[in-house]
C-alpha cells in the first residue's frame, strides 16, 4: 500500500505538478464549460439572444451553490485522505471517502428539493425580474438544471477524491466525457429541435449524469481508498474534519454567489436609471454582459484553481510526511505559474475584448451591447493577475491544513470586499461602480495574501527538512 503513494514524497516537484495539476485543470475547465457552452449556444440562437444570456446569468450563481457544497465535501476529503496517507493511516482515509459519499448524496437531494419549492423567490433574489422575457427564460432553465443537481454534485465531489486515490487521469476523463456529450447535444436541442432554454438545460443534465455514472464506477474500483461497507456510517469527527478542510473551497464559491447576487441586483437597480439600459428593450443587456465577463473569468479561475487543487495531494502528503522543503518548493513554483496565467489573461481582456465578446453572439446585438461589454472586460478584470495569486494562496493554505487562515482570507475577499464594494461603489459611480468592485477587492485582498505568503515561507524555513 505504501508504494502506491510514496512517490509523492520523492518524485521531482515539477513532474508531480504536471501529473496532478494538468488533469485537474482540464477537469475544472471542462466542468466550467457546461455553463459556458450553454451560454455560447444560447447567445447565438437568434430567438434567445441577450434574453437567454441574461437568464443564464441569473441561474448561474445557483449552480455555484451546488458546486460550493460539492467541492467542500470533495476537496475536504481529498486533503483529509492525502494527509492520512502521508501518515500511513489508510483505514482513516477510507472512512473519510465513505462519509463524503453519504454527505454528498444527502445534501444534493435536499438542495434540489429546496430549489424546486422556492424557485420563484430564488430567481427574484438573483435579478431574474429585470424584465418579463428574462424571467420566463430563467424559470424554464432553472427547473431542468435543478433536476440534475444530484448528478452534478456527486460528479464534482468525487473528482478530487479520485485524484487523491492516485488517478487524476480518470478524474479528467469522467468530466471530459460528460462535457463532450453536452457540447454535442446543445446544438441539436437548441438549433435542431428548437427546445430553447429547456434544450440547453437538458443537454447539461445528460452530461452530468454520464460524469456521475463514471464516478460511481470508479468508487467501486478504487485502488487505495475504496470504502468498505462500514465506512459509509457517518462519524462526527471525520465529517467535521472533512468539512473543515473543505470550508475554504465552500466559502470561495458560496461567497461568490453572495457577490453575484449583490452585483445582479445593483445592475438591475442602476441599469434602470441609465438613459439607455433603463429602456425595456435594453434592460437585460448589463446583466447579460456581466454574465459573459464572469464566464471568461471562470475559465481563467478554473486554470488557476486546477493548478492549486491538483497540488493538494502533493502538499498534504509532504506535510504529513514532514518534508517542508518540498512544500516550500511547490509553493514557489505554484505562485509563479499562477501569476503567468494572470498575465496571459490580462493581455486578452485588455487587448482583445471584442474577439472575446464575439463568441457570445455579439453580431446579433446592438452597439450598446458591444460598447458596454468592451468596457466591462477592461475594467472588471484589470487586476486579474492579483486575483490569480490570491486564489492560489487560498487553496495552498487549505492544503497545508491552515483552515482558519485560508477561510478568513477567502471570506474577506468575497464577502467583506466583494459584496461590500458591489453595494457601495454604485452609489457614487452608478453602473460603472459595479465594474470597479472587482479590481478594488483584488488589490486589498492581495495586501493580506502577501503577508500570509511571507508568513508561510518563514514557517516552512523554520521547520527544516526532517
Language-model features and meaning:
Residues 1-21, 81-148, 192-247, 315-383, ...:
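Short alpha-helical transmembrane segments in multi-pass integral membrane proteins
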Residues 9-48, 61-76, 80, 105-112, ...:
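N-terminal transmembrane alpha-helices
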Residues 19-38, 144, 178, 207-211, ...:
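Transmembrane helical elements of multi-pass membrane transporters/channels
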Residues 26, 30, 34-37, 66-70, ...:
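Residue-level hotspots within pore-lining transmembrane alpha-helices
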Residues 27, 144-163, 171-179, 200-213, ...:
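Short runs within selected transmembrane alpha-helices of multi-pass transporters and secretion channels
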Residues 29, 33-54, 123-132, 188-194, ...:
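Helix-terminus/linker motif at the lipid-water interface of multi-pass membrane proteins
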Residues 50-61, 138, 142, 201, ...:
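Small-residue hotspots at the loop-to-helix junctions and early N-terminal turns
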Residues 53-113, 152-171, 287-347, 351-353, ...:
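Small-residue-rich hydrophobic transmembrane alpha-helices
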